[in-house]
């Protein structure tokens, strides 16, 4: 998998899965623009990417911010070839206690942003007759999870959105797919007690948590020419926790 000459935009790239994706695409030759919600986060991305790309501040819920970032990318690097929608948040609560803003924040950040970003890069991809759009979903989007009705709805929505868009643009050489992680090793999971960790692992036939690099590898495959005939799919990376 060689991405020489390709421009990749990865949202939410300051740490965790987003950083692993950005570093993996850069290591394989892409120029990577990673985004963060703060200037400090954007600078951190610039620091780790070095000559392989740049960090920019982006509010994925703001159309003006999206257009500004894309203008900067066009001016310095060119049109986006690979879009990785990774930015996301959680606002967990039981439905009976969930406030409207907790619902709306998740839908805007985790779902509507994918619509806006995908639309913003689409014209150039169609003109080139080539493009890759990969969105980071979640196992919760297919199996559900108590206390996450908002998050699960958004992640399920990503799947329907991606399937529909895939049908619209497949004839132009553009693929649209979802990678749905299960439990992934993060700072949060590392802070769990032994009992809490055991409870999670009991749900995973593989007997371990996944790594951010394993998600990045899946994204890199879907972004590659080797995956040119795969579109409208959701690739589940969850150690057997949920099998579709």
From Swiss-Prot:
This is 3-oxoacyl-[acyl-carrier-protein] reductase FabG. Ca(2+) 3 binds at residues 233-234. It comes from Escherichia coli (strain K12). Homotetramer. GO terms for molecular function: 3-oxoacyl-[acyl-carrier-protein] reductase (NADPH) activity; identical protein binding; metal ion binding; NAD binding; NADP binding; oxidoreductase activity, acting on the CH-OH group of donors, NAD or NADP as acceptor. The gene is fabG. The keyword Lipid metabolism applies. InterPro entries: 3oxo_ACP_reduc, NAD(P)-bd_dom_sf, Sc_DH/Rdtase_CS, SDR, SDR_fam. Its EC number is 1.1.1.100. Calcium ions stabilize the structure, and may inhibit FabG activity by obstructing access to the active site. It comes from the Bacteria. Belongs to the short-chain dehydrogenases/reductases (SDR) family.
């Amino acid at each position: 998998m060689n991405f020489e000459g390709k421009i990749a935009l990865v949202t939410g790239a300051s740490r965790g899965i987003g950083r692993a994706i950005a570093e993996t695409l850069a290591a394989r030759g892409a120029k990577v623009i990673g985004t963060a919600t703060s200037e400090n986060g954007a600078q951190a991305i610039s620091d780790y990417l070095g000559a392989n790309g740049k960090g920019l501040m982006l509010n994925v819920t703001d159309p003006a911010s999206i257009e500004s970032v894309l203008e900067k990318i066009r001016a310095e690097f060119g049109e986006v070839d690979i879009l990785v929608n990774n930015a996301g948040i959680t606002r967990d609560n039981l439905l009976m206690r969930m406030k409207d803003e907790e619902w709306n924040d998740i839908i805007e950040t985790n779902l509507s942003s994918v619509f806006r970003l995908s639309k913003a890069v689409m014209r150039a991809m169609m003109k080139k007759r080539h493009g890759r759009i990969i969105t980071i979903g979640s196992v919760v989007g297919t199996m559900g999870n108590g206390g996450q009705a908002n998050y699960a709805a958004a992640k399920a929505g990503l799947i329907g959105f991606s399937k529909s868009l895939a049908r619209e643009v497949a004839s132009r050489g553009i693929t649209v797919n979802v990678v749905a992680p299960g439990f992934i090793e993060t700072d949060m999971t590392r802070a769990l007690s032994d009992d809490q960790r055991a409870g999670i692992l009991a749900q995973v036939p593989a007997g371990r948590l996944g790594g951010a690099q394993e998600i990045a590898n899946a994204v890199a495959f879907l972004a590659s020419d080797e995956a040119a005939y795969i579109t409208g799919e959701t690739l589940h990376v969850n150690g057997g926790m949920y099998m579709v």
